[in-house]
């Protein structure tokens, strides 16, 4: 009720508030230093070819099965151009359309992370499939591309402002924190569906600037 259905990760707010309470109670109030998380540099990076082959084959099979189940291009196009957010793709448009969305959206995500030069470690691989979890809840390339664009624009904007202010800018578009942040920004796709691509992009820019500071509030007790 708080976010009115405009964030598909509906558990994020209550869990985040609980994490904020735990961080404040167990660490901040008691004056205990919160243990630092391991640096992203310590994560093992997989071969880009291996990850692309694994994801490409697995996700591509979803497209094959969707076609075998009778999914037509016009059915999937109806999802991409739906005037309202489709809250349950499988029940409203059919299981074959849902599977097609998993395949097409999955390849779309994979292409984006390749394009920005993201490191394919365990975290990155995990968030690809985390984003795919929203396929049945209505996320698809048509309402997520403005969010991706918003993140890219926000990265350049923040970098430029940092230079002017004499700051030490580290949150480039392929930084691990920003790569993960996009995963959760993906949940804002209902904003694009209802208000259009521009406001979806604006929501993504706002999310980019907030996501760098939220972990300081909940202290890592919440993965969102």
In which residue ranges do the predicted regions lie?
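Alpha-helical multipass membrane-protein architecture
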Residues: 1-224
């Amino acid at each position: 009720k708080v976010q009115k259905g405009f964030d598909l990760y509906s558990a994020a707010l209550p869990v985040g508030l609980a994490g904020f309470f735990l961080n404040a109670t167990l660490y901040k109030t008691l004056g205990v230093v919160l243990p630092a998380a391991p640096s992203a540099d310590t994560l093992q990076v997989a071969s880009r070819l291996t990850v692309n082959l694994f994801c490409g084959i697995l996700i591509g099979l979803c497209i094959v099965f969707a076609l075998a189940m009778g999914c037509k291009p016009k059915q999937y196009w109806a999802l991409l151009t739906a005037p309202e957010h489709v809250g349950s793709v499988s029940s409203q448009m059919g299981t074959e359309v849902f599977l097609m969305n998993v395949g097409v959206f999955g390849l779309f995500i994979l292409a984006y992370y390749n394009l920005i030069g993201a490191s394919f470690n365990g975290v990155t691989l995990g968030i690809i499939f985390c984003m795919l979890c929203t396929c049945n809840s209505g996320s698809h390339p048509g309402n997520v591309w403005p969010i991706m664009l918003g993140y890219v624009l926000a990265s350049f904007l923040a970098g430029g402002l940092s230079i002017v202010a004499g700051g030490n800018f580290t949150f480039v578009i392929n930084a691990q924190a920003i790569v993960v942040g996009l995963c959760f920004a993906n949940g804002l796709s209902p904003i694009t569906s209802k208000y259009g691509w521009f406001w979806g992009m604006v929501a993504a820019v706002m999310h980019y600037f907030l996501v760098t500071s939220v972990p300081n509030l909940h202290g890592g007790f919440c993965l969102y």
